[in-house]
């Protein structure tokens, strides 16, 4: 049986300040929890309605009380946030730099896309949403366990690298015609404002995903997660 303190504690991890203080985050569902365990994330506590599952056995009603999902998925786990402070920031291969991505769903989807396309690392500006937000974790569908993610000063990072820096901009070259290298950093910007001016000045190769309107009116822009998928796909296609 869950105590009131347990319920209160798990629910408190919805807030970034509490996650930061406790160095803990929540993941839900057999797929996400299983992937995190396989990747070596250290569980603080596990709650499950399945008696075959490790951890504390709870009822469906109790799981509902601690879950952040509309329809809880059998298991909820609290994991330790890995210490990335001493992780070397040395981009290799093909990486993503996220400049102020705000929507948790977009961030989670981008992480999942990065996992699918074999992106080596993701570098997030301090203005980007917290990767350990429960909504982000769930949107990754377990990919958070597979892609190294680091928060850093993007301008500082980009000023030190010697690889190509790509960014999707309205004044860029057609991505389908542009010669792309296998290694580099792809910058994706904020949903409303795009790539910030400071980061934009660091971009060495400007890319454009053209529309195919046939002169009719189209959407003003692409969702940032969709744009990320198109861009990563084009890099991997070459």
Please place each PLM-identified region on the residue numbering.
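Boundary-proximal intrinsically disordered activation/regulatory segments immediately upstream
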Residues: 1-50, 128-129
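Amphipathic alpha-helical repeat scaffolds
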Residues: 29, 102-110, 219-226
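Structured adenosyl-cofactor binding patch, chiefly the S-adenosyl-L-methionine
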Residues: 116-117, 131-145, 197, 201-238
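Active-site regions of enzymes building and remodeling cell-envelope glycoconjugates
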Residues: 52-64, 93, 164-165, 179-185, ...
